[in-house]
From Swiss-Prot:
Responsible for synthesis of pseudouridine from uracil at positions 955, 2504 and 2580 in 23S ribosomal RNA. Belongs to the pseudouridine synthase RluA family. Keywords: Isomerase, RNA-binding, rRNA processing. Gene3D superfamilies: Pseudouridine synthase, RNA-binding S4 domain. PROSITE patterns: PSI_RLU (PS01129), S4 (PS50889). It catalyses: uridine(955/2504/2580) in 23S rRNA = pseudouridine(955/2504/2580) in 23S rRNA. This is Ribosomal large subunit pseudouridine synthase C.
Length: 319
């Protein structure tokens, strides 16, 4: 075990940091400190803004001076996210684009975007270890743990606000590639089916089509056909949890190796065909958005990993 005892910090709030709640700001300043401890020091008045006590919901203003007390964090050495860890180092190799406002990476399958829920490592924690000097690193959107591909991270609060606005106004276009069961009918260009999210006692999220759910739409285009499968391009119009996975299942064409909404018989066929596939075949292939700093329209593409490419080549050869 090691114990870290940082000294008192006084942080002047910049215009870019203004507008966020003090509890969220402290989470970026006190990396690795449990939320319960952050709320405790707020409740006790150990955190001061302009020498006054504040509540967790206080919104910071430019020019505010925040006093952050010393926080003792006992942690196991091996559990700390270290820049020397192999996974953290590997993140440097999958960065597709970076400037002062944003960072875009090709997230590997099997890596969560956030640590927690029993996971010791997440992309955002890894990036913070990789970029310890960065004052701000926040996810613009999410990808499921087993989905690979384009993931956008904001390096400024103003960039995060701009990109979130684009998401709300449907000004951001996401394209995914999915390998689905059977022959997708070319005339099925869109699936519109409301989705309802349920949280099981285990904490697991399950989504199903329900008239009580939120309106949801995904557009589809056939990219390539194989003997018993189809590669489709999926473009979600709305951004619901597990949307593409549930919409393909609803259309009768579940995604390969989807342990929640898939078809084991389809997975077995792929295994017997020698594809070597053992992960969800859902890849965020491209993201189109307006750059929050320059106003330039950008389209960033993420190549598929070798495992997905090999799988498709096997299916081509078997036609």
């Amino acid at each position: 075990m090691k114990t870290e005892t940082p000294s008192v910090k006084i942080v002047a709030i910049t215009a870019d940091e203004a507008g966020q709640r003090i509890d969220n700001f402290l989470r970026t300043q006190l990396k690795g400190v449990p939320k319960s401890m952050i709320y405790r020091i707020l409740r006790k008045g150990e955190v001061r803004v302009n020498k006054k006590r504040i509540k967790p919901e206080y919104k910071l203003e430019a020019g505010d001076e925040v006093r952050i007390p010393p926080v003792r964090v006992a942690e196991r050495e091996e559990e700390a996210v270290s820049p020397h860890l192999q996974k953290v180092a590997a993140l440097a190799d999958v960065i597709l684009y970076e400037d002062d406002h944003i960072l875009v990476l090709n997230k590997p399958s099997g890596t969560a975007v956030h640590g927690g829920s029993g996971l010791s490592f997440g992309v955002i924690e890894g990036l913070r270890a990789l970029r310890p000097e960065a004052r701000f690193l926040e996810l613009v959107h999410r990808l499921d743990r087993d989905t690979s591909g384009v993931l956008l991270v904001a390096k400024k609060r103003s960039a995060l606000r701009s990109l979130h606005e684009q998401l709300r106004e449907k000004g951001m276009q996401k394209d995914y590639l999915a390998l689905v069961r059977g022959q997708w009918q070319s005339y099925v260009k869109s699936v519109q089916a409301p989705l309802l999210k349920n949280i099981l006692q285990s904490g697991e999220r399950i989504v199903r089509v329900s008239q009580e759910g939120k309106p949801s739409e995904t557009r589809f285009k056939v990219e390539e056909r194989y003997a018993f499968a189809t590669l489709v391009r999926c473009s979600p119009v709305t951004g619901r949890t597990h949307q593409i996975r549930v919409h393909t299942q609803y259309a009768g064409h579940p995604i390969a190796f989807d342990d929640r909404y898939g078809d084991r018989e389809f997975d077995r066929q792929l295994t017997e065909a020698g594809t070597g596939l053992n992960r969800l075949f859902l890849h965020a292939a491209a993201l189109k958005f307006t750059h929050p700093g320059t106003g330039e329209v950008m389209r960033i593409e993420a190549p598929m990993d070798e495992g997905l490419k090999r799988c498709l080549q096997k299916l081509r050869n078997a036609r």
